[in-house]
Amino acid sequence: KVFAVIVVCFLFSLKVKVPVYIEDAVAAIAWAFQHIGKYGGNTDLIFLSGHSAGGYLTMMVGLDKKYLSKYSIDANKIAGNIPFSGHTITHFTVRKEKGMNDIQPLIDEYAPLFFARPDASPLVLITGDPELELLGRYEENAYMWRMMKLAGHKRTTLYKLEGFNHGSMAEPAYPLLIKEVNAITKEILKRK
């Protein structure tokens, strides 16, 4: 099987403030929906993924429906959201913009957790080892997994990669991403 990968480099937070970097990611994703057909792609099979801040952006775009709606795209049209070690609370960069420190949690309109809902696209959370991860990242993702379940979401999965830290967890996460993309793709194509 062949995957087409669109790599988006997001804006640096030193130059812009929230929500500009979220909106920039949304514009790139909207471009994919609007143009993937020209490259032989299928809008029913667009998956989002990213590591760390990219994982945070993946979840913000996939869960807060207002962002893609500006482009007349329903966030539920995303085939699956597969963040690698993403913040599920408000990102520490946003908290820093608000004068907060790295370990002071916040769940507001800039937190994927704020938008836990039953009808979201499949969500596959992948993190490193709780003892090696950055700033409680595994625990944030475990909380997201639980809240999605409590919200009635039927397709949230959590993977914990023992022995891998925040930076090294990406390499062993890719086979899981491919496995999940293949499984979700099969489900989607079966419904067609």
Go through each PLM region and give its residues.
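Catalytic nucleophile-loop/oxyanion-hole region of alpha/beta-hydrolase
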Residues: 6-43
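The feature captures the conserved acid-bearing segment of alpha/beta-hydrolase catalytic domains
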Residues: 72-94, 102-146, 150
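Active-site loop/turn elements of alpha/beta-hydrolase fold enzymes
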Residues: 3, 10-12, 86, 161-163
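Primarily recognizes the serine-hydrolase "nucleophile elbow" in alpha/beta-hydrolase
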Residues: 30-97, 107-108
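A fold-wide structural signal in alpha/beta-hydrolase
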Residues: 2-6, 47
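C-terminal catalytic histidine-bearing segment of alpha/beta-hydrolase fold enzymes
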Residues: 142, 149-192
